[in-house]
């Protein structure tokens, strides 16, 4: 059970970090 929770948390963090990096990249491109 603990492994599943850690896996879900890992996936959630990966999605959040990816979304933030993509969003920041788009803002940087638009700013130029």
Curated annotation (Swiss-Prot):
Gene: petM
Subunit relationships: The 4 large subunits of the cytochrome b6-f complex are cytochrome b6, subunit IV (17 kDa polypeptide, PetD), cytochrome f and the Rieske protein, while the 4 small subunits are PetG, PetL, PetM and PetN. The complex functions as a dimer.
Localization per Swiss-Prot or TrEMBL: Plastid, Chloroplast thylakoid membrane
Family of the protein in this entry: Belongs to the PetM family.
GO molecular function (one): electron transfer activity
InterPro entries: PetM_cyt_b6/f_cplx_su7
Membrane topology recorded in Swiss-Prot or TrEMBL: Single-pass membrane protein
Disulfide feature: none
Organism: Emiliania huxleyi (Coccolithophore)
Bilayer-crossing regions: 5-25
Keyword list, A-Z: Chloroplast, Electron transport, Membrane, Photosynthesis, Plastid, Thylakoid, Transmembrane, Transmembrane helix, Transport
GO-annotated biological processes: photosynthesis
Keyword Transmembrane (UniProt): yes
Top-rank taxon, per record: Eukaryota
KW Transcription (keyword) present: no
Protein name: Cytochrome b6-f complex subunit 7
Primary role: Component of the cytochrome b6-f complex, which mediates electron transfer between photosystem II (PSII) and photosystem I (PSI), cyclic electron flow around PSI, and state transitions.
GO cellular component: chloroplast thylakoid membrane; cytochrome b6f complex
